Amino acid sequence: MTDTAAVRGLDAQGYIAREGSLARVPAVFRPVVAAARERLTDLFGVRLHSAYLYGSIPRGTARVGRSDLDLLAALHDEPAEADHAGARALVEALDAEFPQIEGGGALLYGRARLLSDLERHDMGFFVACLCTPLLGHDLAASLPRYRPDTLLARETNGDLGLLLPRWRERVARAGDAGDVSDSEHTRRSLVRYMSRHLVRTAFTLVMPRWNGWSSDLRVMADVFAGYYPERAAQVRAAAALGYEPTGDAAVLTAYLDDLGPWLAREYTRVHGTKAARPEDATAS
């Protein structure tokens, strides 16, 4: 592997290298990971095909009391709503028990969907390159290797235009909350989520030209800035808020009225629109 390829998250052949490993999990987070492994097994039993960690914990960059626990579980069959509810309860229990983490989430998919043609360059890529095996047989063995090309860009983040109306609804609901402290907390969560999503979308917009991969928000923002200097300050500010969010409603307004719509238009112009998913037809 060349030094340049390593810095840009690629292997010697120019494919995106898998990030994260259990060996990189900081010692303080290992009890959380062990508990997650045990409880996922208890929750899903023989229905569980495999489970994965992703995010800062397996990358070794998690911050005590600030980072969340991110899990993905692949079931042999398609998950039902009760399964999603059970996974949410599992993460909430871990969050309450372990002060090392601040929140988290668990994605649930059926094995067949993760290996499908439709998901090959979205969730398939996510599992193969951004997830660290925790339990079961690693699905990456059944998935291709990935280059940072326009197909990957389109299928990972080419749906921002579809997401923006849903984000507006979430922000409106946060504004309608009766309890001021609850509203502040909700806005802070939305700022964190939207900031990260917009920075990642800005990065994958230019990813094929840069020819590399990173999951570091600041690196992503800096890479984007090299191609769109007129938007650099906005995306760098979003990267900072992705790590240290506030509950400022003005930030959300700027995302929804300016940066988000511009980025969605430019993304569609450059890469096209992500292939429709079945749930898109029924999503509100």
Segments predicted by a language model, with ranges:
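Conserved NTP/Mg2+-binding pocket subregion across the NTase superfamily
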Residues: D3-V28, V32, R88-S189
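Conserved nucleotidyltransferase catalytic core and NTase-mimicking acidic/glycine-rich helix/loop elements
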Residues: T2-A6, L139-S284
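Generic structural marker for isolated residues within well-ordered, non-membrane alpha-helices
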Residues: R37, V91, A221
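Catalytic metal-binding acidic patch
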Residues: L53-A89, G105-L108
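Short acidic amphipathic segments
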Residues: R47-G55, I101
